């Protein structure tokens, strides 16, 4: 599957993004403030889009597809709906529940067919979960050292209120669809809408 392979910390610096939003504890040695000429309105809008794509690990075509889907929804604002759709990706939900140290690792776990949604194997990272969905690691995979190592890192993280995770049994439930104030990504979605509306 194609994805952005640029060095993570370098990309974070370019976007003014703290690595912790990606699940990475490493700190950049450089200051996040970037000197130079003032960014244009278009440049600011473009950077917000790039930031959202980078956080969720989504390339342009699927990102645009999510935007078009968000635009057609009959409720909420397009920008908020876009972020909600990105949050409801299976790879992101796995990351949020603590079953991946990063979204990239969570995506690999889904790709490798370790994940069940309502008892059925799903290996599509972009799969959209729904309220009430029960997500679990396959029984034969639960004893793998990989998950012990992951939980050593993620067990102390706060699971969002719209999700429930049972780390002992490697399961979780989507309690509800998240609202914008439950999504902690530092993205101004209004600027993304303005960019695509040009």
UniProtKB/Swiss-Prot annotation:
<dbReference type="InterPro" id="IPR036986">
    <property type="entry name" value="S4_RNA-bd_sf"/>
</dbReference>
<keyword id="KW-0687">Ribonucleoprotein</keyword>
<dbReference type="GO" id="GO:0042274">
    <property type="term" value="P:ribosomal small subunit biogenesis"/>
</dbReference>
<comment type="function">
    <text>With S5 and S12 plays an important role in translational accuracy.</text>
</comment>
<keyword id="KW-0689">Ribosomal protein</keyword>
<dbReference type="InterPro" id="IPR018079">
    <property type="entry name" value="Ribosomal_uS4_CS"/>
</dbReference>
<dbReference type="InterPro" id="IPR001912">
    <property type="entry name" value="Ribosomal_uS4_N"/>
</dbReference>
<keyword id="KW-0699">rRNA-binding</keyword>
<dbReference type="Pfam" id="PF00163">
    <property type="entry name" value="Ribosomal_S4"/>
</dbReference>
<keyword id="KW-0694">RNA-binding</keyword>
<dbReference type="Pfam" id="PF01479">
    <property type="entry name" value="S4"/>
</dbReference>
<dbReference type="InterPro" id="IPR002942">
    <property type="entry name" value="S4_RNA-bd"/>
</dbReference>
<dbReference type="GO" id="GO:0006412">
    <property type="term" value="P:translation"/>
</dbReference>
<protein>
    <recommendedName>
        <fullName>Small ribosomal subunit protein uS4</fullName>
    </recommendedName>
</protein>
<comment type="subunit">
    <text>Part of the 30S ribosomal subunit. Contacts protein S5. The interaction surface between S4 and S5 is involved in control of translational fidelity.</text>
</comment>
<dbReference type="GO" id="GO:0003735">
    <property type="term" value="F:structural constituent of ribosome"/>
</dbReference>
<feature type="domain" description="S4 RNA-binding">
    <location>
        <begin position="88"/>
        <end position="153"/>
    </location>
</feature>
<comment type="function">
    <text>One of the primary rRNA binding proteins, it binds directly to 16S rRNA where it nucleates assembly of the body of the 30S subunit.</text>
</comment>
<dbReference type="GO" id="GO:0015935">
    <property type="term" value="C:small ribosomal subunit"/>
</dbReference>
<dbReference type="InterPro" id="IPR005709">
    <property type="entry name" value="Ribosomal_uS4_bac-type"/>
</dbReference>
<dbReference type="GO" id="GO:0019843">
    <property type="term" value="F:rRNA binding"/>
</dbReference>
<dbReference type="InterPro" id="IPR022801">
    <property type="entry name" value="Ribosomal_uS4"/>
</dbReference>
<comment type="similarity">
    <text>Belongs to the universal ribosomal protein uS4 family.</text>
</comment>
């Amino acid at each position: 599957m194609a994805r952005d392979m640029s060095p993570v910390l370098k990309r974070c610096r370019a976007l003014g993004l703290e690595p912790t939003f990606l699940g990475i504890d490493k700190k950049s040695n450089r200051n996040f403030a970037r000197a130079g000429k003032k960014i244009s309105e278009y440049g600011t809008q473009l950077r917000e889009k790039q930031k959202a794509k980078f956080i969720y690990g989504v390339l342009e075509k699927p990102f645009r597809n999510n935007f078009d889907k968000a635009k057609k929804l009959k409720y909420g604002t397009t920008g908020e709906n876009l972020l909600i759709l990105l949050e409801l990706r299976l790879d992101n939900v796995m990351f949020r529940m603590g079953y991946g140290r990063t979204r990239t690792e969570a995506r690999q776990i889904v790709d490798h067919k370790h994940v069940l949604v309502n008892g059925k194997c799903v290996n599509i990272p972009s799969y959209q979960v729904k309220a009430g969905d029960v997500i679990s690691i396959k029984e034969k995979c639960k004893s793998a050292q990989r998950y012990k190592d992951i939980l050593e890192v993620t067990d102390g993280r706060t699971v969002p209120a719209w999700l429930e995770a049972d780390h002992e049994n490697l399961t979780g439930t989507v309690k509800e669809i998240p609202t914008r104030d439950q999504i902690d990504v530092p993205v101004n979605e209004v600027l993304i809408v303005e960019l695509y509306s040009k």
